[in-house]
Amino acid sequence: MVTAAAVLEHLPTLYDYFVTSFSPVLSVLGGPGHNPVLDQLLPVVQRSPLVMCALIAWAATHRAGTGHPYHDVARVSAETVEMQIDSLDVTRDFSNDEREEYMWTLIILGGVEIVRGDSKGWVRRLPMARGMLERALQSVDFKSSPTWQSLAYNTAYHDILSVMAMTRGPKWPAVYDRILNHNNVEIDGYMGATRRIFYLLTEISTLATEVAATLELPESGDKDRELTDLVAGHEALLARLRAVDIPLGVFVQLPIGTDRSHLIVAIEVFRGAAELYLRHTVLRAASSDLQCRLIAKRLMHNLRLILGTPHESQMMFPLFMAGVYTSHDAGRTEIINISTKFSERTGVRSVIAIINLLLEVWKRDPDGTLYVDWRKLAEESGVAVSFG
């Protein structure tokens, strides 16, 4: 039996594994020897035993998932961290160092669950993460703090990509407007240059929730008027989505090893995914919808351009949305093959849950002619699906 003390024996090996082998799949930026995510995370790891333990849990979970004997180390270290976080009184005042420590710990625990393949704990802790982030940014100068920019972008990224599989979106934190529409031209390691599209995804989620609630109302003139307004909201969001462009100056100071062409392609990939999500959740477009099929085909063309690059770490949500609107066998086989190879290469088991969800969609729509509410299927599956 592995004890908490015995976990420390594995610390040097697992720390080195995280830094050199696992962390490169976490960032869409940089190249060999340069990872912007590590620049902000490692200083906190080195001063905080809690974050260090969380990091060991993450690395051990990933290592165990690739066939190495670290299951007990992963379990003990994760349980130790979860016990402390779940007993935390989030209403008390924290120092800035404590805020950083607890936010990184929450995020890393989410990463542990994504590697395991089920994000229930992350979803359960999301209100805590949102609340801590909002309170922190009331007193922190976001524009001048690379650490809090990294924490904020990381939280928003994983929050949004977890909520995409829910039929009822949350009340999004007001601070996400400030985070995702930040005027500075720097790009980040989680969303690259796609932050504004992520903000639109929060608005699409809200609109989709309103559509779902309205459709449940009894037939009436008021219901018809509400649906008309919601369709108008769809048109307005679609126009804003199509107008998203790369901010001026974004290429001035790129991290070493970053390919600007991949940043441009990633914007087109996420633009296509967001439009498919908008049409699916708001207009309830069936898989036979010609416009959606054309968008999916263009999305797949762009996505192939970033396979094997750091940007593929973002690709599961776009790939899934393309799959929903792909009806021919060859296209569906390609999507499964890409997903499977990505899961094998990265050791991230959340991809398996996404593949299983897509296979269930296709099982219910074998010919590509129906509307299948995959978000409802995801909720009924009992697995918390995360595209992050």
Model regions and ranges:
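Start-of-helix signal in alpha-solenoid helical-repeat scaffolds, especially tetratricopeptide repeats
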Residues: 53, 103, 148-149, 153, ...
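Short, surface-exposed loop/turn segments at secondary-structure junctions
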Residues: 65-71, 92-96, 141-145, 216-228, ...
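Hydrophobic/aromatic-rich effector regions of fungal transcription factors
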Residues: 18, 38-44, 54-67, 78-119, ...
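Charged/polar, low-hydrophobicity segments characteristic of intrinsically disordered regions
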Residues: 86-97, 139-154, 189-201, 251, ...
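Cytosolic regulatory protein-protein interaction regions
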Residues: 2-3, 36, 44, 167-310, ...
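Alpha-solenoid helical-repeat scaffolds
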Residues: 5-8, 12, 31, 42-49, ...
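Intrinsically disordered, low-complexity regulatory regions with latent secondary structure
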Residues: 1-27, 33-40, 330-331, 339-388
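Acidic/serine-rich, low-complexity amphipathic helices located in mid- to C-terminal regulatory regions
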Residues: 105-209, 372, 377-388
